[in-house]
C-alpha cells in the first residue's frame, strides 16, 4: 500500500514539475527540460514496473481520493478520484513507455526548431492528461482528463502554426473532438441521473441492478457513449480529422496515433463494459468496426504519402479494436491495443527518419534508402 501511495505522490510531483517548467520556461534551456523529463519519466516508468506484482499478479486495487466540496449539485459533486487497477496500469505503462521514447526522439528531430522547449512541454502535458484520464475513478476526473487530451492535441497539431494546412488541420481535429466531448457530456449526465453516483466502480456495479427500470435510458446512454468513441477513435464517418492531423510533427503523430488520443475511445468502452454488455452497442461496434477496418486497409494500400498511409493504417486497426470490444473479447482488446501502441509509435519514429533522409513524404521517392 505504501508503494501505491508513493506512485500517486510521483504523479503529483509530475504535475508540479510540468507547471513549474511551463511558468519558468524562459529560464530553462531546452536540453535542461529534456534531461529533467526523461530522468523523471524513466524513474516513473521503472517504479510502475516495480509495483507490477501488486497490481497485476495479486489484482491489488488502490484508490486516492481528494474531495473538493466547493460545488455540490444534487448527487454531482466536484471531487478528484484516482484508481490504479490492471486496466489503468497497462494504459499508464504504455503512455510512459511511448512518452519516454518520444522525448528522446524530439531531442534530435526538432533540434533546429525555435520553440522545441514548448513542444517538449506540450508532449508531457499530453501524457499527463492521458494518465489522468485512465486513472480517473469518478465522472469529474474522467471528463477532466478527456477534455485535457483534446486541448493538448490541438496545440500539438498546431505547433507549426505558420503553415496554412496545419492551422486548418488542428481546427478540424478540434471540431471533431468537440463533437465527441458533447456526446461524452450527455453520457455522463444520463449516467449520473440513472445512478445518482459519481464513483465509476459503484456505477458499473449498479448498471446491472438498475437495467430493468431504466432500459430505455440505458440504450440512449449507450448510444451517446458509442458516438463519443466513434469520433474520438476515428471510426467510419468520424475519421476525417485523423489523416489531416498528419500535419503535426512526427513525435506528435506518434503519440496521437499510438497510445493516447485514438485509444481513449477504446479505453472508455473497456471501462464501461457492463453497459456494453447490457445494450445493443455490441452489434454497432462490430458493424462499424468491421467497415472501418476494411475501409482503412483499402485506402492505406493506395496512399503514396507515408504519414497518411500510417494514418489510415491506424484507422483500420482501431476498427479491429472496436470489433474485439463488440464481441466481448476484452482481454484481447487490451493486449491488441498495448501491442499496437508500441508498434505504431516505433513505426512513426522510423517514418520520421525516412522522411528526414529522403526529404519527402512520398513513398515513391524512397527507393534508394538502403544505400544511405
What feature does the model see in each segment?
Residues 147:
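Short phosphate-coordinating micro-motif centered on Lys-Gly-acidic
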Residues 1-9, 16-121, 198-215, 240, ...:
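Transmembrane helix-loop-helix hairpins at membrane boundaries of multipass inner-membrane proteins
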Residues 101-142, 151-372:
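Hydrophobic transmembrane alpha-helices and their helix-loop junctions in integral membrane proteins
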